[in-house]
């Protein structure tokens, strides 16, 4: 018996006021429908049917590389009609799990509970109790057993008082589901084919109907406009922040962190306010992350300190190393153990060796720097000639004076000293002192320029 997941993603989302299909609007830098697809994989789906309509080209451009069966719903005639478009891809012995591309916060654990609640060849529906159920289909029970779902527009006064609502998420047996879909009618207040009508059919046919509920109602909330999208974003971030704290991170203010990827943290991590984490980020033990830091696809080792307003992207920070404030590590940069870069230092495709430091105002690109090196303020590795990039190699224990330019390709030998203001165009041997600045001149009685009269 296979688990066949059907994801409904055909709507335009008019209230979003956007050319982008509704399900492609992002939560934490990932489209809503991608969140749902990822969750479907987590519960062990054997196949995923993506029912699409509006914006097919944009959907396929974003999702096309994944293992999905694309099912076109040319006309949006209701949820029942949408699922029916996937019937040809459903085997009789499949368990069919129906999800929604604009309900991104549904948890795998909730879906697992729903599947576990389903009896053999039975129908399981995910419900939730709301203090204000206005707008939702109500769960109709008789003697405690579910007998049907009535939509808001079709409900009578007594049914409108029910606060258990249908989330739309359900698990059904493939053979019966296909039969029920063929019996749907659009004879209702909205003139649509309601998927919810299959619940009454299941009751009629004597099929066992069971229910499950999510841990939190926010799991089943959708986004029809940008206000609701922002609310889901905040709910996602609150959940992500809670997870970090349970794993060992101290968040200065859990409401002021944005997590837009997969982050792993060690013990006793301190994260200040307004930090943004994107992509795959690993943070070791006893790490301190300052306010306003942006971490993207990077590894931060034990005891490292990232001072405020630094950006670390596709880079590595070693044990006891530090960066910032206002430092930038671009892709391919690495700080080795106990290395340090300070304010307004930028590194790209470069390694700063153990115990080496660049305190301020430097650009280090396409360079390999050994241990115990001092990079003075204003130092620049001139790595680009307008067509190609070249390497700078600085060996151990080199002292680079302030305002030095190293014109690559160039190698500086161990223990060398480069005088401040030098432009280095040739290799420097070990323990040499090199000074290339112009000889200082003294002109006595020099008349300073004065402003011309207008």
Curated annotation (Swiss-Prot):
Binds 1 Mg(2+) ion per subunit. Pathway: Nucleotide-sugar biosynthesis; UDP-N-acetyl-alpha-D-glucosamine biosynthesis; N-acetyl-alpha-D-glucosamine 1-phosphate from alpha-D-glucosamine 6-phosphate (route II): step 2/2; Nucleotide-sugar biosynthesis; UDP-N-acetyl-alpha-D-glucosamine biosynthesis; UDP-N-acetyl-alpha-D-glucosamine from N-acetyl-alpha-D-glucosamine 1-phosphate: step 1/1; Bacterial outer membrane biogenesis; LPS lipid A biosynthesis. Transmembrane segments: none annotated. Residues 248-454 are annotated as: N-acetyltransferase. Mg(2+) binds at residues 102, 224. Catalyzes the last two sequential reactions in the de novo biosynthetic pathway for UDP-N-acetylglucosamine (UDP-GlcNAc). The C-terminal domain catalyzes the transfer of acetyl group from acetyl coenzyme A to glucosamine-1-phosphate (GlcN-1-P) to produce N-acetylglucosamine-1-phosphate (GlcNAc-1-P), which is converted into UDP-GlcNAc by the transfer of uridine 5-monophosphate (from uridine 5-triphosphate), a reaction catalyzed by the N-terminal domain. It is found in: Cytoplasm. Its EC number is 2.7.7.23, 2.3.1.157. In the N-terminal section; belongs to the N-acetylglucosamine-1-phosphate uridyltransferase family. Homotrimer. It catalyses: alpha-D-glucosamine 1-phosphate + acetyl-CoA = N-acetyl-alpha-D-glucosamine 1-phosphate + CoA + H(+); N-acetyl-alpha-D-glucosamine 1-phosphate + UTP + H(+) = UDP-N-acetyl-alpha-D-glucosamine + diphosphate. Residues 1-226 are annotated as: Pyrophosphorylase. This is Bifunctional protein GlmU. Pfam families: Hexapep, NTP_transf_3. Acetyl-CoA binds at residues 377, 383-384, 402, 420, 437. The keyword Transferase applies. It is an enzyme of class 2 (transferase). One of its GO terms (cellular component) is cytoplasm. The lineage of its organism: Bacteria, Pseudomonadati, Pseudomonadota, Gammaproteobacteria, Alteromonadales. It comes from Shewanella pealeana (strain ATCC 700345 / ANG-SQ1). PANTHER family: BIFUNCTIONAL PROTEIN GLMU (PTHR43584:SF3), NUCLEOTIDYL TRANSFERASE (PTHR43584). Residues 227-247 are annotated as: Linker. Keywords: Acyltransferase, Cell shape, Cell wall biogenesis/degradation, Cytoplasm, Magnesium, Metal-binding, Multifunctional enzyme, Nucleotidyltransferase, Peptidoglycan synthesis, Repeat, Transferase.
């Amino acid at each position: 018996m296979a688990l066949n997941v059907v994801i409904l993603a055909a709507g335009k989302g008019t209230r979003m006021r956007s050319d982008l299909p509704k399900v492609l609007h992002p939560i934490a830098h990932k489209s809503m429908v991608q969140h749902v697809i990822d969750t479907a994989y987590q519960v062990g789906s054997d196949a995923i049917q993506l029912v699409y309509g509006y914006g097919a080209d944009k959907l396929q451009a974003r999702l096309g590389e994944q293992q999905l069966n694309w099912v076109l719903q040319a006309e949006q005639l209701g949820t029942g009609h949408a699922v029916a478009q996937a019937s040809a891809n459903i085997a009789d012995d499949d368990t069919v799990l129906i999800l929604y591309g604009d309900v991104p916060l549904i948890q795998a654990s909730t879906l697992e509970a729903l599947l576990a609640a389903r009896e053999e060849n039975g129908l399981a529906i995910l419900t939730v109790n709301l203090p204000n159920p206005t707008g939702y289909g109500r769960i109709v029970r008789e003697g405690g057993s579910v007998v049907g779902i009535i939509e808001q527009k079709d409900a009578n006064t007594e049914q409108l008082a029910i606060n258990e609502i249908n989330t739309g998420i359900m698990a059904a047996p493939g053979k019966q589901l296909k039969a029920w879909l063929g019996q749907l009618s659009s004879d209702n207040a909205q003139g649509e084919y309601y998927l919810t009508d299959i619940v009454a059919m299941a009751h009629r046919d004597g099929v066992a109907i069971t229910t499950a509920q999510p841990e939190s109602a926010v799991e089943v909330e959708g986004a029809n406009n940008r206000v609701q999208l922002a609310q889901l974003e905040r709910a996602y971030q609150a959940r992500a922040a809670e997870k970090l704290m349970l794993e060992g991170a101290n968040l200065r203010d859990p409401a002021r962190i944005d997590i837009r990827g997969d982050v792993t943290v060690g013990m006793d991590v301190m994260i200040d306010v307004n930090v943004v984490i994107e992509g795959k980020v690993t943070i070791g033990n006893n790490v301190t992350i300052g306010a306003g830091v942006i971490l993207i696809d990077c590894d931060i080792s034990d005891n490292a300190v990232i001072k405020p307003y630094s950006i670390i992207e596709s880079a590595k920070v070693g044990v006891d190393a530090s960066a910032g404030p206002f430092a930038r590590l671009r892709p391919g940069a690495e700080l080795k153990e106990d290395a340090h870069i300070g304010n307004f230092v930028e590194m790209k495709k470069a390694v700063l060796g153990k115990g080496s430091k660049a305190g301020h105002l430097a650009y280090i690109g396409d360079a390999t720097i050994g241990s115990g090196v001092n990079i003075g303020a204003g130092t620049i590795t001139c790595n680009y000639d307008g067509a190609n990039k070249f390497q700078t190699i600085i060996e151990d224990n080199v002292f680079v004076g302030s305002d030095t330019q190293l014109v690559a390709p160039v190698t500086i030998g161990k223990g060398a000293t480069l005088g401040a203001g030098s432009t280095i165009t040739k290799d420097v041997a070990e323990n040499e002192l090199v000074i290339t600045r112009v000889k200082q001149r003294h002109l006595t009685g020099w008349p300073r320029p004065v402003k011309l009269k207008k």
